[in-house]
Amino acid sequence: MPPPLVFLSHSSNRTPGALEDTGKLRDALAGASHDVQLDFRTIQGGDDWYAKILEWLVRCRAAVLLLSPDALQSDWVYTEATFLKVRKQLDPQLILIPVLIRGVTKQSLSSAEKFIPLQLHTLQCIEATDAASSAPQVLAALGPAVHLVVPEQVQAADKIAALLVRMGGMDLSNTFVALTLAEPPWHPGTDRNTLMAQLLARHMLKLGISSATRIMDVLGRGIDASAKADICRILAAFWVHEKAANHISEAKQRTPTAWAVAINGNFLPDFTAEAYARRAFWPSEQWRFIPIEGGAGTDFVRHVTESILKWVERRNPGSQRKPEQWLARTDISLLVVIPERQWVDHQALNALRLKFPRITFILETGEELPDLHGEGFSEVTLARPALDLLEEDKAQQAFSDAFAMIRGD
């Protein structure tokens, strides 16, 4: 994820070379991986510059005020400085750095009639000849550009919001009324429909998959069915316990062959396994289940092997590479569900793991999650905490009902 935004306030209209000087400071900060927003470098022709600057003023986590003689006469710099000083009082975490350049001093700043009420001279100021030469001190004041680690739930909400926005022509106001939600206040620089989509997405995640049928009904018919289906899949993934799901991604990293994962439940092949995988690899979509076709017969290893190789051939028609070569090189995380544990003993499972070292095999254990190590399954991870079967049943039923409604659109 990108680092927090840094806003650069300046006035460069009257002094020759001032724009170039300000641009050099911006480049120095950007070169240290800061996300710097500067009007004449970032705003393009046709953009609503006023809305864009307001958005930066609201969103920035740090701001640099370049206070030159021109800036102290600028109504717009005064407006930006006022907004940022109020933000600083409300949010002490905001980094606000006055940089005094081209002869401006703390004393002259404190006596500048327009800026006196802001008391900017009481902040830790940087004094420099020009903007470019202030770069080392500004970088020290900003500190390292720490990239944000966005929680999975926030990423999921953003994804759902993007899907809601994709449903063109939908009036989210009606959805808010139906769900008895308060509409969000206006936020400068942001489309109102986008704000409503973000709030609705967070509400969906809070309610979870159990609310899917109600939400699909409220969204209405005739709306992008594929987007609604994707929303249901995300809600299903976040029903799964994160710790249990992570056993799948961790098992894939084992060497020299991926470990198998044992999961209890009653709906593994049709619902639960996909929810586990989506949560395990979130937000990546680079994973696939390989279905095991038909009955296992007497030679289980041979049957599974043939099913895997046929799936690869169907996926890559006309490929010059053999299925085994594709399996060895693909970046896609591949999984195979073994829906009946009695189909395989530890020797057969080990044979499959050796034959397909990059595939994660998932064992369905039924209602309980027994300790399989006593049965000789030495390289099997138990997906704990175990599933609550009642919760699984509710989630699967809600998911199934929601999809039935989507298919009826």
Describe every region a protein language model picked out.
Residues 216-262, 271, 275:
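Walker A/P-loop-proximal flanking segment of P-loop NTPase domains
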Residues 269-272, 287-313, 317:
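Conserved phosphate-binding/catalytic loops and adjacent sensor/switch elements of nucleotide-binding enzymes
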Residues 256-287, 307-308:
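P-loop NTPase Walker A phosphate-binding motif
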Residues 1-66, 85-94, 278-285, 295-296:
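Conserved N-terminal substructure of TIR/SEFIR domains
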Residues 69-90:
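Conserved TIR/SEFIR loop-to-helix hotspot centered on a Trp-containing motif
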Residues 1-31, 100-189, 193, 198, ...:
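C-terminal interaction surface of TIR/SEFIR-family domains
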Residues 310-353, 365:
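Conserved P-loop NTPase "ATPase switch" module shared by AAA+ and STAND
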